[in-house]
């Protein structure tokens, strides 16, 4: 891949939105959040549960690495780590690696995971207060920093508290790449500022893993939607960008 990448209109929109979101005063402090992932035409982020799936084309992958270079930190869920074993670094383009953050309520991250092999940025693993201290010790020896975050009401890690903690660590911008549970939670809790969605010309069918699961929205009569939407063809893929807002005009189901 060629590291000389021209900045697209969508990348410029992302940069401008990050700058505004970082300055925004919030009731609960958090970083500016960019939700970014790739899906098939039928809304799947994987062809089969538990198996890695190549979705984006080469040109779209370059965009993903540009986005990584624009953020202080990058977050994924434990299933993404176990299935894809990502490094979460910036490659193919110039830029600094973001701080890797993993949501791992049971500390299942393998000490030999690729993201723990990069020494430039220490990996942050967010877990629950009751997680195994023996597993924590192994991950700390592997180079990770383990932090314990309160549990959310419906289970899992309380994202608002994690994001507050990240902001206190001077993480001003956070890119979220998945997986499905993380994507759904960020949308349901209105914790994102913008979405960068890559749509590949593929179908995965019934066996595919949906990008968005049930949206248990904090405000039941509102749903997340995009505004100021932009579209751009990148190779055979379609890139969609927009600011994430709540559509307060949406009526309750039924």
Please provide the spans of the model-predicted regions.
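Enzymes that bind and transform nitrogen-containing heteroaromatic metabolites
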Residues: 1-254
């Amino acid at each position: 891949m060629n590291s000389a990448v021209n900045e697209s209109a969508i990348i410029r929109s992302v940069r401008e939105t990050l700058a505004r979101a970082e300055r925004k005063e919030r009731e609960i402090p958090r970083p500016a959040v960019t939700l970014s992932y790739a899906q098939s035409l039928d809304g799947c982020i994987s062809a089969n549960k538990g198996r890695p799936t190549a979705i984006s084309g080469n040109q779209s992958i370059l965009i993903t690495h540009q986005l990584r270079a624009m953020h202080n930190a990058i977050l994924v869920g434990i299933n993404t780590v176990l299935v894809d074993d990502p490094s979460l670094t910036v490659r193919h383009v110039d830029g600094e690696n973001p701080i890797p953050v993993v949501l791992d309520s049971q500390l299942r991250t393998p000490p030999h995971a690729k993201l723990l092999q990069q020494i430039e940025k220490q990996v942050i693993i967010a877990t629950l207060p009751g997680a195994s201290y023996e597993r924590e010790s192994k991950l700390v020896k592997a180079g990770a920093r383990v932090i314990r975050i309160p549990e959310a009401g419906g289970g899992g890690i309380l994202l608002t508290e994690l994001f507050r903690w990240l902001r206190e660590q001077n993480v001003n911008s956070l890119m979220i790449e998945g997986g499905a549970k993380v994507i759904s939670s960020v949308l349901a809790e209105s914790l994102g500022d913008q979405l960068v969605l890559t749509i590949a010309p593929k179908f995965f069918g019934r066996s595919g893993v949906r990008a968005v699961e049930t949206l248990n929205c904090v405000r039941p009569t509102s749903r997340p939607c995009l505004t100021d939407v932009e579209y751009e063809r990148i190779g055979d893929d379609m890139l969609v960008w927009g600011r994430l807002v709540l559509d307060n005009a949406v009526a309750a189901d039924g």
